Design a protein with these regions (language model features):
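Glycine-/charge-enriched secondary-structure boundary and capping motifs
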Residues: 2-13, 121, 125-139, 152-157, ...
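N-terminal amphipathic/basic leader segments beginning at the initiator methionine
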Residues: 2-38
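Residue-level signature of catalytic and energy-coupling elements of molecular machines
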Residues: 17, 68, 181, 254, ...
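Buried hydrophobic packing segments
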Residues: 24, 28, 50, 94-95, ...
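Glycine-rich phosphate/pyrophosphate-binding loop regions near the starts of catalytic domains
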Residues: 27-190
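Short, glycine-/Ser/Thr-/acidic-enriched flexible segments
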Residues: 56, 69-70, 164-168, 190-192, ...
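Short loop/turn motifs at secondary-structure junctions
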Residues: 102-104, 199, 248, 333
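Short, acidic (Asp/Glu-rich) active-site segment that either coordinates a divalent metal cofactor
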Residues: 158, 171-225
Length: 351
């Protein structure tokens, strides 16, 4: 016992507070409990999270995984001392990816690295993760909080995670079924989402003069740049799952880093191209402000940001209205922005 106490004291002297870790776990348990579903087989604290697979009715169940983080959006959360929504971003970046395959999220695990474990802050972060899990129907079955003194400043942290989903093999989206004349539907984004923040910090000189982002901005309808930037990434899982049950979806793209030019082609087969009507895209004011302030060419903006479109979905032209009705009923701002055309050169054209 004396040896253990001595070891703990030495660990604390090195900057790792074990007691804070225990307290953080206790504070986050209420958040985690919100995410429990029928697949959960154990409580928080075990060495591994156990989850029963819901494979009834599936011929060939396939697990689909995705991992991601929030990029330097975390820096904004730290600067604003607002940590209760950044976890939504971490979940969104993963579950929005796996839904592009047609997979329903089952569970999520998070990883937080921090300079100093402040239990209340960690609980806020995990509270956001839990909210993202609730929005996507995933269970938060585990995670890790690692205290890294000497490696990270005390106030800093990073957040990442991974999601696992399931889909029947025959229902995995197959882009080779896409055809000329199919329609491209846009799902509106909630804002910047979770990429391009290093450029944003440079454009608005946030690191040198952070006070500017807290002033109300006319271009943003009176909102501050800060609150606009920190708006959580929209989670599309439940609306897209409803769509998949009723419409012959040919392809889905999650518009993240690389914008339209990098992400839309990922769901387009060779020989076809998504022809996007630039005038149809509902560009959010924050993107116009970034472009104007940073003197950034429009193509570069569409090659970096979602520009107001968080996801694109390709459906047969004959099913467009059905798709729009379903998506609207589930709270999405959905509209047609283009069509699929033949092309052996480019896979996406904006004009």
């Amino acid at each position: 016992m004396e040896h253990n106490n001595s070891q703990s004291a030495s660990y604390a002297a090195a900057g790792v507070d074990i007691t804070a870790g225990y307290k953080a776990v206790e504070l986050m348990k209420t958040h985690i409990a919100r995410t429990r579903n029928l697949g959960c087989l154990d409580d928080v604290g075990g060495f591994g999270g156990c989850f029963g697979l819901p494979i009834a009715g599936m011929e060939e169940p396939v697990l689909v995984s995705g991992t991601d983080g929030c990029g330097t959006k975390v820096k904004l959360a730290i600067l604003m001392d607002k940590h209760d929504t950044i976890g939504i971003d971490a979940v969104a970046m993963c579950v929005n990816d796996i839904i592009c395959v047609g997979a329903k999220p089952l569970f999520f695990l998070d990883y937080i690295a921090c300079g100093k474990n402040v239990p209340e802050k960690i609980a806020q972060i995990v509270g956001g993760v839990a909210e993202g899990c609730v929005q996507s129907g995933a269970a938060l079955i585990g995670g890790e909080t690692a205290e890294h003194p000497g490696l990270m400043p005390a106030e800093d942290y990073d957040l990442a995670g991974f999601a696992v989903g399931i889909v029947d093999k025959k229902k995995i989206l197959d882009k080779t079924k896409m055809a000329e004349g199919d329609a491209v539907i846009a799902l509106a984004s909630s804002g910047i989402h979770s990429n391009g923040f290093s450029l944003i910090r440079k454009v608005f000189r946030i690191d040198e003069n952070p006070a500017e982002i807290y002033r109300p901005c006319d271009a943003l309808g009176g909102k501050t740049i800060a609150e606009t930037l920190l708006t959580p990434t929209k989670i599309y899982v439940k609306s897209v799952l409803a769509l998949l049950e009723n419409v012959d979806v040919k392809g889905i793209s999650h518009i993240t880093g690389g914008g339209f030019y990098e992400n839309i082609p990922r769901s387009i087969p060779d020989g076809l191209c998504a022809k996007i009507d630039r005038s149809a895209v509902k560009v959010l004011p924050i993107f116009d402000l970034i472009a104007k302030t940073g003197n950034i060419p429009e193509r570069d903006m569409f090659n970096t940001y979602n520009m107001g479109v968080g996801m694109t979905i390709v459906v047969p032209a004959a099913q467009v209205q059905t798709a729009l009705d379903i998506l609207t009923a589930h709270g999405e701002d959905a509209y047609v922005i283009g069509t699929i055309v033949k092309s052996d050169e480019e896979k996406v054209i904006l004009e």
